[in-house]
Amino acid sequence: MKQNKTKLVIAVLLIAFLFTGCIGVDRSFRNMRDYVLSYSGNEFEKEFEFSFGSISIGMAELVLDFAETEEPIDEILSEIDNVQVGIYNNLSSSKVKSSLEELKFITNKMESAGWDCIVRSVNKDEMTAIFLKYNEETLNQLFVISVNNDEVALVEILGNLNKVIEIAIREKGLDFAMKH
């Protein structure tokens, strides 16, 4: 009897580990990562790269149920299906190019894959771009690319982002603090 319980516990832990969604990023994310990193011509080292699926996000929601917060974090998380993040450190002695030319190449690549660019910024040694993708009328994907001399950061969020925006506006209104 005790041996069966031990096997059951091990099986449950193994299943929980395998299906939490905390795994490597998907092919489209890797393709964009490879494109951005190779364009600079520099050598990069992966600091971290991961993906949280719906089960991992659901587990985070359960933990947040016990946290005392007035923020609607659990409600927002319930609308998110997947989050992919990658941080890559520049190992080269040369600086990463953050130019308008590079931004145009990245934007063209993303637009050819069905993304709409909503923010593009090049400022001295830093470049940032934010892209959206829609499924019919619903905003369901957000992709952020940030490049500076030291690192490249990529973030992709999938889910019902219309609902996430609705929750944010409901809770905070349109009174967003702006840095001048």
Give the positions of each predicted feature:
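Bacterial N-terminal signal peptides that target proteins for export
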Residues: 2-10
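C-terminal motif of bacterial Sec signal peptides marking the signal peptidase cleavage site
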Residues: 18-21
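Bacterial signal peptide processing site
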Residues: 23-26
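Early exported N-terminus immediately downstream of N-terminal targeting peptides
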Residues: 28-102
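Extracytoplasmic
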Residues: 45-47, 78-82, 123-125, 138-140, ...
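Short Gly/Thr-rich strand-loop-strand
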Residues: 104-132
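A short, solvent-exposed beta-edge/loop patch
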Residues: 131-162
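A recognition module on extended beta-rich or small alphabeta surfaces enriched in W/G with H and D/E
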Residues: 163-180
